[in-house]
C-alpha cells in the first residue's frame, strides 16, 4: 500500500531529532563541503571497522518512508544552491525546507534509490529497500551524497554561461539528471522479490542486480568474495549491496573509488571459525574461493587376522580334530563380531573393503566347514584314523573303497540272514511234524 502523506503534514522536529548529529545549520556557507571535511563526520568504511560503532550510543532511526520524496520541493533539490543565491532557485526555500530536503537526501533511500517518483504509483514501496543493516551504512551514504552534490555543483559552475543563460543551462542539466533518476526509479527492485525469505535465513536467495548496475557488478563480486573470506565476518544474515545512481563521465573515477570503499562487513555469511581465511584486503579476497566444509569420513580399522595360505606351514603342535574344529569356529565367530563393531560413517572405498572382507570371512567359514567334514570322514576310515596329515584326495579314495567294502559285507550279511531264515522255517516244520507223530 503506498504511503500518501503530504509534505505539509511532516513533523520537522521529529525528523530533525533523528538526524541532528549530522547537520550544523548555523553554518550555511558551503554547507556540504564543510560537512564532508568535518572532524565530527563518522569514519569512512575504509577505516578501522570497530571505530564505526562509536558513531552513536544507540542505533540511528530507520529512514522515513513517506511520499514527501515525490513533492515538487524535493524535485528542486537537484538545483539547490548551498549559498542561498538565485542561481539554482535555492533562495526561495526557507531554512526549514532546506533542512528537510537535506534530511531526505542523507537519510532517505541510501543515494542509489531514485529521488523522483510518482505519488500515485506503487513504485515508492518498490524502490525503498530495507535499510540500516549496520550503523556504518548511514555514514557511508552521507559521505557519498556530499561528494555527489559537490561534484554536481562544480560541474554546473564550470559549464555555465552568463547569468541569464546559466540559469537556463542549469535547469536543463538538472532536468536531464532528474530524467535519469526517474528512469532508474522505474527499474527498481521490489523488496518482495529480493527478499522472498527472512533475512536471517542462511539459505535465502541472493538479490539480483538490475540492468543499471552493470558498472557495479565487478566490484560487487570482489566485495562478496572478500566478505566471505574476511576473518572479521560475524555470523549475521547476508545484507544487500545497493546500486548507485547514474552519474556523468566527469565523476566516474570518483564513483568507482566510492564503490571500492563500500563497507565490506555489511556483506556477511555464516562461516565456521576454523574455516575463515586470513585475507585482509578486498583485492586479495577477490581471488579467494569460498570455504567448503565436506563431510569428514572416519575410517574404522577392523582386525580380521586373515590367514596367509601362501606362507609355509608353521611348526606348531597338531591339535586333535575336535579341538581344532572348535578353535576354527571360535576364530570365525570372533572375526564376524569384530567386523560388526564398526558402525562409524564410511566412504565408498571403505564400504567396498568391508564387503570384500565380509565375503572373505564367509568364504573362509565355508572352507572351514568343508575341512571339518573331511576330518570327520577321515576319522571313520580305519586306515586313516590316526593320520592327521592325510590329503583330501587320499581321504576320498579310501572312503570310497571303505564304502564299497562295507556294502559288500552288507550284501554278504543279508544273504546269510536269508539262509538262516530259511533254515529256521525248515526247523519249525520239522518240529511240527515230530509233535504230530507223538500225539
From Swiss-Prot:
Glycoprotein recorded as keyword: yes
Biased segments, Polar residues type: 335-347
Biased composition (Acidic residues): 251-263
SUBUNIT field: Efficient DNA binding requires dimerization with another bHLH protein. Binds DNA as a heterodimer with MAX. Interacts with TAF1C and SPAG9. Interacts with PARP10. Interacts with KDM5A and KDM5B. Interacts (when phosphorylated at Thr-58 and Ser-62) with FBXW7. Interacts with PIM2. Interacts with RIOX1. The heterodimer MYC:MAX interacts with ABI1; the interaction may enhance MYC:MAX transcriptional activity. Interacts with TRIM6. Interacts with NPM1; the binary complex is recruited to the promoter of MYC target genes and enhances their transcription.
One term of GO molecular function: DNA-binding transcription repressor activity, RNA polymerase II-specific
Record motif UBR5-degron, residues: 355-364
Protein name: Myc proto-oncogene protein
Purpose: Transcription factor that binds DNA in a non-specific manner, yet also specifically recognizes the core sequence 5'-CAC[GA]TG-3'. Activates the transcription of growth-related genes. Binds to the VEGFA promoter, promoting VEGFA production and subsequent sprouting angiogenesis. Regulator of somatic reprogramming, controls self-renewal of embryonic stem cells. Functions with TAF6L to activate target gene expression through RNA polymerase II pause release.
Modified residues (N6-acetyllysine): 143, 148, 157, 275, 317, 323, 371
Domain bHLH: 354-406
Stretches for region Leucine-zipper: 413-434
